[in-house]
Amino acid sequence: MAKVLVLYYSAYGHIEKMAYAVAEGAKSAGAEVTVKRVPELVPEEVAKASYFKLDQEAPIATPDELAEYDAIIVGAGTRFGTVASQMRNFWDQTGGLWFSGKLVGKVGSVFTSSATQHGGQESTILGFIPTLLHHGMAVVGLPYAFAGQMGTEEVKGGSPYGASTITNGDGSRQPSEIELEAAKYQGAHVAKIAAKLVA
């Protein structure tokens, strides 16, 4: 049984919802799944004034524990076309894991969100993949076998690089059914590949 970590950062709860959908998918594929989040860097008074969702039940992860898992699925919103600084800061503390090769051969995958359709979802995922590759991880995306990412009948996130959701500038749009299904599919897909690698 593969051990899968869904590691996320969510300011307003959109990525949190996606993270639990990813976890559901991974569990459905037989994985042992843990959901954790990275620490908030914004001062609490600023976060409260900005209406951040601070009541998230997932425990805080530490960089060293990444080595305990067979697959790590990373989720964070885009900030100006790249990953949110909270997630970047967390991974910038993994030099010891890199030096000792603790993540080599593990599966890595990424999902994201943005305020608009063209707000940097693909650039965020593609910009984070080199971090996984530098750690020697095997990168897995969201294949077109998930047909939900095809078509133009509705506004939706998702690409072969990973699941994603669109939030609107005011955060009023929640992940749609098809976006959550994409997240579940990605979680299951990663878990199945990780299980083959650890068999």
From Swiss-Prot:
Record-linked PROSITE patterns: FLAVODOXIN_LIKE (PS50902)
Enzyme Commission code(s) on record: 1.6.5.2
Reactions catalysed according to its record: a quinone + NADH + H(+) = a quinol + NAD(+); a quinone + NADPH + H(+) = a quinol + NADP(+)
Keyword presence, Oxidoreductase: yes
Pfam family, one: Flavodoxin_1
Binding site for substrate: W98
Residue spans crossing the bilayer: none
Keywords, in A-Z order: Flavoprotein, FMN, NAD, NADP, Nucleotide-binding, Oxidoreductase
Catalytic class of the enzyme: oxidoreductase
InterPro entries noted in UniProt: Flavodoxin/NO_synth, Flavoprotein-like_sf, Flavoprotein_WrbA-like, NQO
Domain (Flavodoxin-like) ranges: 4-190
Entry-linked HAMAP family: NQOR (MF_01017)
Family the entry assigns: Belongs to the WrbA family.
Protein name: NAD(P)H dehydrogenase (quinone)
